[in-house]
Every structure is written in structure tokens, then in C-alpha cells.
């Protein structure tokens, strides 16, 4: 009985102790609909932008002209050009909340 009366204040203190704060967003792979949902969550009413067609149209003719002229890429040793977009940042690799915010309007 004496042990119980000694442990009661300690148990009450442990019961009232707040839990450690949880991390709201962990760096993770986000692909497809999960990536879109994360953008909606991060950007909210601001919305987000994604214009892949406009980028391809701008880069397409220049790459073809360089290959025909014997410029970089003509020999085929360099491989495909590296892409720098949200899919490469968040799906192929892990991305943070701050990287997602870069795509908000």
C-alpha cells in the first residue's frame, strides 16, 4: 500500500505530460495523385502551376538544331538531358515541404 501511495503522484505526472510534437511533414517520395494532393495541401487557395507542354515546345527545336549541327548530343555519348521539374524532385527523389512551396502561385 505504501508503494502505491508513493507512485501515485508519479503516475499522475506521467499521465498529464504532453507528448512530443510530431513532425507534420517528413521528406518523402510523392508521385502521381499523392503529389497533386500534397501540392493542394501546401499551396491552398494560391494554387500551383505546372506547364510541361510549354517547356517541351521551347526546348524541342533547339535540341534538334544542336544535334543536326554536330553540337552537344550529336555524338550520343552525353545521354539524355537532365530534367529539373517537380516530378524529378519529388517522385524520383525525396522532396521537402519547402521544395513543394516553390511550385505554388
Swiss-Prot record:
One of its GO terms (biological process) is negative regulation of lactation. It is found in: Secreted. One of its GO terms (cellular component) is extracellular space. SMART domains: IlGF (SM00078). The keyword Endoplasmic reticulum does not apply. Disulfide bonds join 31-91, 43-104, 90-95. Keywords: Carbohydrate metabolism, Cleavage on pair of basic residues, Disulfide bond, Glucose metabolism, Hormone, Secreted, Signal. Residues 57-82 form a propeptide. Its main location: secreted. Residues 1-24 form the signal peptide. InterPro entries: Insulin, Insulin-like, Insulin-like_sf, Insulin_CS, Insulin_family. GO terms for molecular function: hormone activity; identical protein binding; insulin receptor binding. PROSITE patterns: INSULIN. Belongs to the insulin family. Insulin decreases blood glucose concentration. It increases cell permeability to monosaccharides, amino acids and fatty acids. It accelerates glycolysis, the pentose phosphate cycle, and glycogen synthesis in liver. PANTHER family: INSULIN, INSULIN/INSULIN GROWTH FACTOR. Heterodimer of a B chain and an A chain linked by two disulfide bonds. This is Insulin. The gene is INS.
Amino acid at each position: 500500500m505504501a508503494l502505491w501511495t508513493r507512485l501515485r503522484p508519479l503516475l499522475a505526472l506521467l499521465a498529464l505530460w504532453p507528448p512530443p510534437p510530431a513532425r507534420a511533414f517528413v521528406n518523402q517520395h510523392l508521385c502521381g495523385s499523392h503529389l497533386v494532393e500534397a501540392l493542394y495541401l501546401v499551396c491552398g487557395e494560391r494554387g500551383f502551376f505546372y506547364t510541361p507542354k510549354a517547356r517541351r515546345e521551347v526546348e524541342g527545336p533547339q535540341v534538334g538544331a544542336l544535334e543536326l549541327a554536330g553540337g552537344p548530343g550529336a555524338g550520343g555519348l552525353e545521354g539524355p538531358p537532365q530534367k529539373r521539374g517537380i516530378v524529378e524532385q519529388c517522385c524520383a527523389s525525396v522532396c521537402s515541404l519547402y521544395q513543394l512551396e516553390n511550385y505554388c502561385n
